[in-house]
């Protein structure tokens, strides 16, 4: 019976859900976040733009997470707009700084794709 329930949960669980993305952002898992990238995704950290394949974008996030002693991720606001675009405003905080985070995602069929992932230090 346990096997049937587990199979049922795994079958209906969407591995590309908005909740999973938020969890990945909270735990700073670049590898999990990369599941939401495609060839058009871009990351902007303090005005420096990074584009490329998933590996390059993942490396950019890894570097940011490694260089900054982040403690907390907090969502400020999220919503949707026209054409299946979802946006999220959030903050990462460290011992010394607060980073503003802005994400735009495209909901394409049953998958979310990060279009833009922007991080700026709050002054």
Segments and roles (model prediction):
Residues 1-21:
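Bacterial Sec-dependent N-terminal signal peptides
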Residues 59-97:
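Surface-exposed, charged secondary-structure patches
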């Amino acid at each position: 019976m346990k096997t049937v329930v587990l199979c049922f949960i795994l079958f209906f669980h969407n591995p590309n859900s908005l909740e999973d993305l938020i969890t990945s952002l909270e735990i700073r898992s670049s590898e999990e976040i990369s599941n939401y990238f495609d060839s058009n995704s871009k990351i902007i950290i303090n005005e420096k733009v990074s584009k490329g394949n998933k590996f390059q974008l993942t490396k950019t996030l890894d570097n940011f997470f490694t260089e900054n002693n982040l403690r907390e991720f907090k969502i400020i606001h999220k919503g949707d707009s026209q054409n299946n675009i979802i946006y999220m405003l959030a903050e990462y905080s460290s011992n010394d700084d607060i980073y503003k985070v802005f994400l735009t995602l495209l909901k394409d069929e049953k998958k979310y794709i990060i279009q833009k992932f922007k991080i700026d230090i709050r002054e």
